[in-house]
Amino acid sequence: GSEMCIRDRDERARISIYRGPNIGAPPANDPMPEDLRGKITIKVDDYVTTDHIMPAGSRLKYRSNVPKYSEFVFEPLDPEFSRRAAELRDQDVHNLVAAGVSYGQGSSREHAALCPMYLGVKAVMAKSIERIHAANLVNFGIVPFTFVKESDYDSLKRDDDVEIPGIRDAIERGDEVVEAFDRTAGEKVLL
């Protein structure tokens, strides 16, 4: 058979990829720590759509520049979220999201997981998470948790410090329930 486009290694090594001023390299995620300690950086209500998480419209032009596009995560709900999350990420503090029912409904927008990942979000704890959005979260290294008791959502507050000990082992074992500890409120939450 004939091969299409065979290039030798020397020629490939000389090829450069040019990106325009608005195209950045895709970000990589850090590995999940053994024990996840973080801060609830935002608490959102029920029925948060992917458009609430990652606005489109005039912001969509930045989709190839994840650092820039990430400046608008949760903008319709909390315009200061991305600044807060980036500051915590830069201090090596993981960001956590607390959410109500049907988190991530709407269009399957990968950037609604990619941009929060870039900002250091490691887990979403929700009453329920839409199936496709949950898959996108997993694909970008964000753990989608649902509360065993939906009422636990009510006890969590923005800025609470939360720890999920043994998270990496729990993921590898496929545990169906994990314990989280709200260190600020002194309460245990089952996810």
Where are these regions (language model features)?
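Short, small-residue-biased leader/transition segments that mark boundaries at the very start
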Residues: 1-6
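Non-catalytic terminal/interface segments that mediate subunit docking, oligomerization
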Residues: 7-125
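A generic structural signal for short, non-catalytic loop/turn and secondary-structure boundary residues
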Residues: 8-10, 35-36, 90-91, 138, ...
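Active-site lining segments that contact anionic ligands and/or coordinate catalytic metals
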Residues: 12, 37, 94, 121, ...
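NTP/phosphate- and nucleic-acid-binding module
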Residues: 30-32, 49-50, 57-62, 68-70, ...
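Short, structured coil/loop segments at alpha-helix boundaries
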Residues: 66, 78, 85-86, 130, ...
